[in-house]
């Protein structure tokens, strides 16, 4: 597959992943599917906006760049037929790095939150974090330590797990584009388009 075509495929995959990440992060503001009375009762990691910023906003820009690569004109520099395409592929590599860092941020925030557990109203009538070092992951009986919001443990665990998986997939896809972009920069795309007037190799 041409490097431009590969990038377009990656971009088309990143867009829905970014949308799902944003939606998952938004749902975290409604623990157990309910509106909280006090925002301070939400887990700290929810406010880090891992899904909205990391896997969402910072992923949209690279995805759009990747999608536009296949149609990019390859006649851009002083009459050199491959220069424009190579520069576009190099630029996509930089955007892929940005996307990778955003996905990594979301991945780390999600992993920390899963290990830490949700903030909830505990049996001692205070709000806090009753779990330690992910102990609740292997012992569902510990979930009873959280009295309110109802079902906050499975809610947070499910949504942060989704963000963890999405972040991991996005990191892999962006890493692939870094390699793909470098190959496109060094070797050129498999064909020349636009003002170059034909399907000549570069």
From Swiss-Prot:
Extracellular side: 31-48, 115-158
Localisation: Membrane
GO cellular component, one term: membrane
InterPro entries assigned to the protein according to its UniProt record, in alphabetical order: L6_membrane
Membrane topology: Multi-pass membrane protein
Keyword set, alphabetical order: Glycoprotein, Membrane, Transmembrane, Transmembrane helix
Official protein name in the record: Transmembrane 4 L6 family member 4
Classification lineage: Eukaryota, Metazoa, Chordata, Craniata, Vertebrata
């Amino acid at each position: 597959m041409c490097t431009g075509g590969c990038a377009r495929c990656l971009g088309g995959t990143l867009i829905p992943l970014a949308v799902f990440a944003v939606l998952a992060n938004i749902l975290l503001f409604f623990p157990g599917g309910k509106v909280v009375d006090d925002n301070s009762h939400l887990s700290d990691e929810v406010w880090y906006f891992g899904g909205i910023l990391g896997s969402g906003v910072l992923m949209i820009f690279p995805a759009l760049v990747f999608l536009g690569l296949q149609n990019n004109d390859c006649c851009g520099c002083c009459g050199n037929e491959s220069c424009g395409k190579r520069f576009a592929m190099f630029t996509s590599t930089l955007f892929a790095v940005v996307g990778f860092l955003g996905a990594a941020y979301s991945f780390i925030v999600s992993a920390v939150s899963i290990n830490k557990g949700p903030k909830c109203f505990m049996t001692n009538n205070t709000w806090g974090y009753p779990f330690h070092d992910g102990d609740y992951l292997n012992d569902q009986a510990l979930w009873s330590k959280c009295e309110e919001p109802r079902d906050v443990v499975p809610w947070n665990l499910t949504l942060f797990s989704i963000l963890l998986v999405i972040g991991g997939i996005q990191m892999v896809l962006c890493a692939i584009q870094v390699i793909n972009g470098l190959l496109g920069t060094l070797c050129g795309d498999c064909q020349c388009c636009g003002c170059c007037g034909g399907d000549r190799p570069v």
